[in-house]
């Protein structure tokens, strides 16, 4: 899954973006890149690399003198969907005139039709990606207002996106937007950060805002403004993240798998602390909006998850059947909405996602709600999409 990090403020964006991209490496990727915006309107600096973030970091040190300063920057780790994994197809992508740079997570389903229209207007394409059309569309729609140009471009897209945009014409502005792919905003004094996952920016701030689908963020170092695509102001809740950066780093272990295995006892203890009331023989699950009567009439449990969350769900299936005596099954979330699953009236669906933003699991949640299931989300991020829905 791709990763996004962006920064605007007085500090050097390179270090902030690179450290954020390193924290997103666990998600898997095949290439990485950054776009940097000088404060004086000079051309954007684009550096991309096939391979690891460490390879990108070395290229940046070789390409950019230490005396150079930048007002803003965006970075990306790519997992190839359209176009092979190489330096050209890596993000960021740049508009024809070089004024706009874009990083994008998601899939643009109508990119072929958009690409043909742009080619007829004289636009050339360097990459084989769907994402490059966004950069050219922004240039095509630009009439002096960066947010308006991004909004006009987004209205032409079909599919999913989480994007971040910078422009040499607006060195004091960073624009981000989401539809089906997460964007979180880090709220700080005199600077703004954005990312596709809170883990990328948690070492800088624990005060964040999760954008909703259809939101567009316009950020400067000292202000953030969130509107709809149609420029209607919207208000989003400020969320406090109560875990720290140590929980997402390897902490001396050789790899994350080994760390997770050894941390299981502490993780389980932390999970039940304050929730398991031994003296009363019951539990206190304040975050679960499901009353005891609804629980009592649950006749079947369906678990939907992906990856390692799916493996956790496999264990959960045995525990539900062993301790609760409730028939349970486990589903690959990626297949759930395509197989017309049978959801009976008293089915409880448990969706498991570490980030709370896993696209396939979120789609399974929405399918379960449509079919009348009682849906519970199990995730680590309180303000994530699955937690809210």
PLM ranges: what are they?
Residues 296-389:
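Glycine-rich phosphate-binding loops that contact phosphosugars or nucleotide phosphates
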């Amino acid at each position: 899954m791709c990763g996004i990090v962006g920064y605007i403020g007085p500090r050097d964006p390179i270090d902030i973006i690179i450290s954020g991209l390193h924290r997103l490496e666990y998600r898997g990727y095949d290439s990485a890149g950054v776009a940097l915006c000088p404060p004086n309107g000079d051309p954007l600096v684009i550096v991309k690399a096939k391979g690891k973030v460490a390879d990108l970091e070395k290229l940046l040190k070789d390409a950019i003198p230490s005396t150079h300063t930048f007002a803003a920057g965006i970075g990306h780790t790519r997992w190839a969907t359209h176009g092979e994994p190489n330096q050209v197809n890596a993000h960021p992508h740049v508009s024809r005139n070089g004024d706009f740079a874009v990083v994008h997570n998601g899939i643009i389903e109508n990119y072929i039709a958009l690409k043909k229209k742009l080619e007829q207007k004289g636009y050339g394409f360097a990459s084989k990606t769907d994402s490059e059309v966004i950069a050219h569309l922004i240039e095509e729609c630009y009439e002096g207002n960066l947010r308006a140009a991004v909004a006009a471009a987004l209205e032409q897209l079909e599919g999913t996106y989480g994007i971040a945009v910078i422009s040499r014409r607006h060195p004091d502005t960073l624009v981000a937007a989401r539809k089906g792919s997460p964007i979180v905003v880090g709220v700080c004094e005199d600077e703004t950060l954005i990312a596709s996952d809170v883990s990328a920016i948690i070492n800088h701030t624990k005060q964040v805002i999760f954008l909703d689908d259809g939101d567009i963020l316009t950020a400067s170092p000292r202000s953030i403004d969130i509107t709809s695509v149609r420029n209607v102001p919207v208000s989003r809740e400020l969320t406090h993240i109560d875990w720290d950066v140590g929980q997402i780093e390897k902490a001396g272990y050789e790899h994350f798998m080994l760390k997770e295995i050894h941390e299981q006892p502490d993780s389980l203890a932390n999970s039940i602390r304050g929730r398991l009331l031994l003296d009363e023989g019951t539990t206190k699950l304040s975050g679960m909006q499901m009353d005891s009567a609804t629980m009592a009439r649950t006749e079947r449990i369906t678990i939907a998850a992906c990856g390692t969350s799916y493996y956790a769900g496999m264990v959960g299936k045995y525990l539900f059947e062993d301790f609760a005596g409730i028939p349970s099954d486990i589903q690959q979330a990626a297949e759930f909405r395509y197989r017309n699953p049978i959801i009976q009236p008293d089915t409880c669906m448990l969706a498991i996602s570490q980030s709370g933003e896993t696209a396939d699991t979120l789609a399974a949640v929405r399918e379960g709600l449509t079919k009348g299931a009682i849906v519970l989300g199990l995730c680590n991020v309180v303000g994530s999409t699955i937690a809210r829905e």
